[in-house]
Amino acid sequence: MAKQSMKAREAKRAKLVAKFAEKRASLKAIISDVNVSEEDRWNAVLKLQTLPRDSSASRQRNRCNQTGRPHGYLRKFGLSRIKVREACMKGEIPGLRKASW
């Protein structure tokens, strides 16, 4: 189990990403637009730097919904490999079974 503080930190990051997503996207569009003047592009870079660091989507970490484990995360299920295996063995995930060949 991950610490509660780590789960809370990730939840806070998710809120910040959602809050600033539109603003970040518009600033990045200005920065990458070659038709905008150099001064305006530089001002957009400076504004982007003033946004909170945790508002960047790349700062988020996928975590298991049950345990908060950061490694071995399977996107399809939203769980870690350990919890997917446990659920699979109990028959809780329809259509998923242990491989045999």
Swiss-Prot record:
Has the keyword Ribosomal protein been applied to this entry? yes
User: Which PANTHER family does the UniProt entry name for this protein?
Assistant: 30S RIBOSOMAL PROTEIN S14, SMALL RIBOSOMAL SUBUNIT PROTEIN US14M
What Pfam families does the record point to? Answer: Ribosomal_S14
Q: What GO terms fall under cellular component here? A: cytoplasm; small ribosomal subunit
Cited HAMAP family: Ribosomal_uS14_1
Write down the Gene3D superfamilies for this protein, in alphabetical order: 1.10.287.1480
Describe the function of this protein. Answer: Binds 16S rRNA, required for the assembly of 30S particles and may also be responsible for determining the conformation of the 16S rRNA at the A site.
Gene name tied to this protein: rpsN
One Gene Ontology MF term: structural constituent of ribosome
What the record says about family reads:
Belongs to the universal ribosomal protein uS14 family.
How it assembles, according to the record, is: Part of the 30S ribosomal subunit. Contacts proteins S3 and S10.
Q: Which UniProt keywords apply?
A: Ribonucleoprotein, Ribosomal protein, RNA-binding, rRNA-binding
Matches recorded under SUPFAM superfamilies:
Glucocorticoid receptor-like (DNA-binding domain)
Q: What is this protein called?
A: Small ribosomal subunit protein uS14
User: Is Protein biosynthesis there in the keyword field?
Assistant: no
Q: Which GO terms describe its biological process?
A: translation
